[in-house]
């Protein structure tokens, strides 16, 4: 038996009951994207029941080839780390620390001391905008561009020709250690290398995330302890700080992630968990408020879905979900606090089963643990009994 789980990063399906506390009322990544572009052409996701969850222009409601529902986020927050941790069974009591006014001066001073480089920026900003704003000064002085966002992130941007990527990575490791020493609960430190000339800088694919170690036992730990290999595709390794990952496969685009997932399905014929994150929706289109790019990326995934189905075996399960929203049609360029779809199919899965509104993303992880027959996670309610005949 194998479980293949694909997280469509930021593909939310409507506001959470508490969205207004996050300034996200009215957000609905899928519905609003479809409306903005006229319609979405997602015939295969429609077959999995996506159109039964909301009125998505172009995606009809129809009897599903498996099970479908939505999941609510129990943890406070709306970032990838919080979302993925909850998918794996960790519900945060307190949100990660945010820095709407930049990082404290004493932290930055110590960071400068340990890296031997000055810091410029130190404020919330769009990554593409801040390199345009401070890129020249960075080139002239070698200072590191440090910035944050509405998420719990400490980001360091540097031009590859000014600060070699290996040094940038070392600076990120210093930042990770420092934040932990200072007692700040920051989800991720992110290396943001770029290249090119002012004002047309471009970020290179050598981004690297340094995640906070998951604060509790979670799905991947339990699987690996039970000798079930976990194959992480995309940024899965980074989001769990490498915990519970047997092998990791980096990707440079959604299509690369899809192809690597299909290759694993074809090659790894033993019992295993294949866990993929496709980040382009979020990184390339959601944050940049580009509904047309977002729609195209969804359609590209949909087009490749039959290839995944074709390579699944009798006792395989496919789960498709998301980790938060990032509505490209709202004025905000940040993530949105949204519900997420949960779609499941496989030969053993009952047809056209409505899973309802699940109280937590952790139901996803608990169900997968239940299917593998490993010990229960600390959070979540399994819906295995709804899936199987």
UniProtKB/Swiss-Prot annotation:
Disulfide bonds: none annotated. Keywords: Cytoplasm, Isomerase, Manganese, Metal-binding. Pfam families: Metalloenzyme (PF01676). It is found in: Cytoplasm. InterPro entries: Alkaline_phosphatase_core_sf, DeoB, Metalloenzyme, Phosphopentomutase_DeoB_cap_sf. Its cofactor is Mn(2+). Mn(2+) 1 binds at residues 9, 323-324. It catalyses: 2-deoxy-alpha-D-ribose 1-phosphate = 2-deoxy-D-ribose 5-phosphate; alpha-D-ribose 1-phosphate = D-ribose 5-phosphate. It comes from the Bacteria. Binds 2 manganese ions. Pathway: Carbohydrate degradation; 2-deoxy-D-ribose 1-phosphate degradation; D-glyceraldehyde 3-phosphate and acetaldehyde from 2-deoxy-alpha-D-ribose 1-phosphate: step 1/2. GO terms for molecular function: magnesium ion binding; manganese ion binding; phosphopentomutase activity. Isomerase that catalyzes the conversion of deoxy-ribose 1-phosphate (dRib-1-P) and ribose 1-phosphate (Rib-1-P) to deoxy-ribose 5-phosphate (dRib-5-P) and ribose 5-phosphate (Rib-5-P), respectively. Belongs to the phosphopentomutase family. This is Phosphopentomutase. It comes from Pseudothermotoga lettingae (strain ATCC BAA-301 / DSM 14385 / NBRC 107922 / TMO). The gene is deoB.
